[in-house]
Amino acid sequence: WYLENLTDEASRKIWEFFQGIEKEGGIVKALKAGSIQKKVNATAAKRYELADQRRQSIVGVNQYVNLAEKKLEAPEGSCCSAHKGHGCCKNADIQLPEVEMSVDSACKAAGEGFSTCLINKALVAGVDCKCGEPLEMEALPKRRLAERFESLLAKADAWVEEKGSRPMVFFANMGPLRQHKARADFSRDFLRAGGLDVVYPSGFQTPEDAARAAAESGCAVCVICSTDDTYPEIVPAFCKALRETRPDMMVALAGYPADYVEAFKEAGVDIFIHVKANCYNTVEAIQNKIGL
């Protein structure tokens, strides 16, 4: 039943959308007016927001990133390699004449082996709207949901290629495993969305010991990992000890204890890693601090 209900709901929304286009005078007028572009851009912005907050998962990109994964190369002759000047079909090097604006003519060209990019180029060249005036409208950009996070990963990969090692973040894990593991594991996965790896030590007994290890790690950023009820005792002492030797080090806190956020900022916490945080913005800020 639920599938039928969702299908009915989707079909009604789609039909409403088509009726809106017809009210504007058809697809061409709607595109020229920019109403379709506006709706598409609004949807894209919302989806980017969900992905940035990891409320929409992109496995391997903003969730469950495998830093050891090797980048695939596009095989010769694929559509991806066509952008580099290689053929993606048997007639890629042939100049296709103007194609009439009809489904039949486009299908015929495709059946003869012409690529979609050549067919599109020929269609555009032949468009005159039957009135002698060229069509002018706002173009919809090519975009993918994963591209923002892929840009972060690309910067980290470039760092690895230049430095020979992955950019690292130090984890100030406090107390026994049960005290820090949940937030440390979450923060590690969070940071991997930007291609960052972590120094993951056993739990420290005192904030001073953790601050000393963080300062000596050589990392530009550290993350305090513990529980909300222990943070009031740990955070001020850790920040004070760290500032004595590494005042330039960025301090992140795993979690967001609302009652203490302002106090912890005053103590020296720069950024918070938590489930409601904007992952893209947070990781980008950490990358910038590291120097990517």
Feature locations, PLM:
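Domain-level signal for soluble alpha/beta catalytic cores
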Residues: W1-L292
